[in-house]
Swiss-Prot record:
Its EC number is 2.4.2.10. Belongs to the purine/pyrimidine phosphoribosyltransferase family. PyrE subfamily. The keyword Coiled coil does not apply. HAMAP family: PyrE. GO terms for molecular function: magnesium ion binding; orotate phosphoribosyltransferase activity. Pfam families: Pribosyltran. This is Orotate phosphoribosyltransferase. It catalyses: orotidine 5'-phosphate + diphosphate = orotate + 5-phospho-alpha-D-ribose 1-diphosphate. Catalyzes the transfer of a ribosyl phosphate group from 5-phosphoribose 1-diphosphate to orotate, leading to the formation of orotidine monophosphate (OMP). PROSITE patterns: PUR_PYR_PR_TRANSFER. InterPro entries: OPRT (IPR023031), Orotate_PRibTrfase_bac (IPR006273), PRibTrfase_dom (IPR000836), PRTase-like (IPR029057).
Length: 183
C-alpha cells in the first residue's frame, strides 16, 4: 500500500507553512481526516495497520479523539477487537468515558494517524492503563518522529516520513514571509 499516494490522492498532503501542535513549523501537513473520510481508504489503512499487529492478542484498540476515532474503529475491525477512544479531560490529560469497556488485564493497541512527538497517543495510553488495560503496541499510519518516538512496546507505522520541522527562530519559511497556518 502506497500510503503517501493515498494522502496525495485524497488531498490530505498539504503544502505551505504550518504551525504544528508541537510548536514546530513545517512546509508540509498531513490532514488525515481528508483521507479517513473515504470509507474504502480508511478500511484499507485499518487492515494494513492491523496486519502489523495480527500476532498480538488485542482486546481493544484506542486512539485520541476526535481524529483517531475512525482509525481506532477500522483497526479494531481488522483485528476483531473493540474500538475505544480517549477524550481530553480538561486538565491536560485524557479519559475514557463511562460505557466504554476496559476490563483489568485487557490487552490493547494504541493507534494514531500521525506520530510526531507521540504525546497525544501517550495520553490515550495513560487513560487506558488507568482503567487496567495492558499496552501491547502502538501503531500509526505515519511516523514523522524521525525515530524519536518510543513507547516501551513495539511501535510500527505504515510509513516513516522525514518531514522538515523548524523552531520558529530558525524557520526559513518565516524568513521568506510565507504566511503561517495553524493546524
Amino acid at each position: 500500500m502506497d500510503v503517501l499516494e493515498l494522502y496525495r490522492r485524497t488531498g490530505a498532503l498539504l503544502e505551505g507553512h504550518f504551525l504544528l501542535r508541537s510548536g514546530m513549523h513545517s512546509p508540509f501537513f498531513l490532514q488525515s481526516a481528508a483521507l479517513l473520510q473515504h470509507p474504502l481508504y480508511a478500511e484499507a489503512v485499518g487492515e494494513a495497520l492491523g496486519k502489523l499487529f495480527e500476532d498480538e492478542k488485542v482486546d481493544f484498540v484506542i486512539a485520541p479523539a476526535i481524529g483517531g476515532v475512525v482509525l481506532s474503529f477500522v483497526v479494531a475491525k481488522a483485528l476483531g477487537a473493540r474500538a475505544l477512544f480517549a477524550e481530553k479531560d480538561g486538565r491536560g490529560g485524557m479519559l475514557i468515558r463511562k460505557g466504554l469497556t476496559v476490563n483489568p488485564g485487557d490487552r490493547f493497541l494504541a493507534v494514531e494517524d500521525v506520530v510526531t512527538t507521540g504525546e497525544s497517543v501517550r495520553k490515550a495510553i495513560r487513560a487506558a492503563e488507568a482503567r487496567g488495560g495492558v499496552l501491547v503496541g502502538v501503531g500509526a499510519i505515519v511516523d514523522r518522529s524521525g525515530g524519536r518516538a518510543a513507547f516501551g512496546v513495539p511501535f510500527r507505522a505504515l510509513l516513516a516520513l522525514e518531514v522538515p520541522q523548524y523552531p520558529e527562530e530558525a524557520c526559513p519559511l518565516c524568513r521568506e514571509g510565507v504566511p503561517l497556518e495553524e493546524v
